[in-house]
């Protein structure tokens, strides 16, 4: 079981009190809060390696590119992706969803194809698919939630077709 208090301690911003209660941040699709380890790594990077990647041969550019590609390799390994070049970094979830809807969706979905979302989606995971439906003629379906507030898995199974 995850120790929520221990995890919260890794996030300096969550030490704040708002309206008399500990801060809770639930809008991470566009901007996620950073744990201390990430903040420290960013500071080290800005102090030692800050440069454009894949754009130069000088020391800092080479160092930054090497670090960037090393992270791509580690990410591929962690995700079980055989080719690190298949890993694409985006600035946030919102940008990633838009990229998938535009690049993959436009190339692979057409009239009558079905897209299944849930009624629990963040706004950033609804609009790109609505726009895709408008461009392609695909059909958008929504899976509901149970009275207990969880995803209705039976409804999901019924919405996913051949």
Regions found by a protein language model. Give the residues of each.
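Pyridoxal 5′-phosphate
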Residues: 1-162
